[in-house]
Amino acid sequence: SIGKDSTVLLWLARKAFFGHVPIPLVHIDTHFKILEMIEYRDALARQWKLEMIYGENVDALCAKDTFPDGNTSRIQCCKNLKTEALKSVLSGDSIRYRMDRQTGNYEPDKNTEPFTGVIVGVRSDEEGSRSKERYFSPRDKNNDWDVADQPAELWNQFKTEFAPGTHVRIHPLQDWTELDIWEYILRENIPVVSLYFNRGNGTRYRSLGCAPCTKPVESTARSVEEIVAELKDGKFSNIA
């Protein structure tokens, strides 16, 4: 989403590889994201010299099988525009679009090889299903997740080998909290999209997604320092 969590994940990758991210960045474009998110994504990709790729569910968009078009539920819309789109992008079954960093334009990606692993910036405290994920979370040959078939992870022991034709999702931020994220952003001075801050109307976004389903919260926080204070001792203290 190029929100705070994925931006922190990118920052960690840049630190690990001395300012360079040697793997593609995949974004799923639902076409309902807040415009500032897309603008920020592209600006960051050019500034940090990221190998930026995006994918989409063209069939669902053309059929208007979406919640904003009034033809399906929010949950089914998320499945259509996010889950199914991600599956086809990872498998290489749908068109991927790659950014030309010189022009900022996107062109169909000639590489259709499947991705066998993807690093994701989800956190266990975001919602129930994510709390059941592992650091190394396998998907089967249909890209489906069997929550009952998760490998045990004890201390620093992780299963990192998986069957051919499957892929693994890696969650380095699994045990980070929202406060951890913002404290790290403050410590490292990481840039984030301005939607997270009160810009004079008494509201800001705590999380970002599609415009029809993402709503701002009442807040006076205009800076990272004020967001940290709000999460530590303010109105959002201990509230997910």
Kindly label every feature range from the protein language model.
Residues 1-240:
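Nucleotide-activated chemistry modules centered on ATP-dependent adenylation/adenylyltransferase
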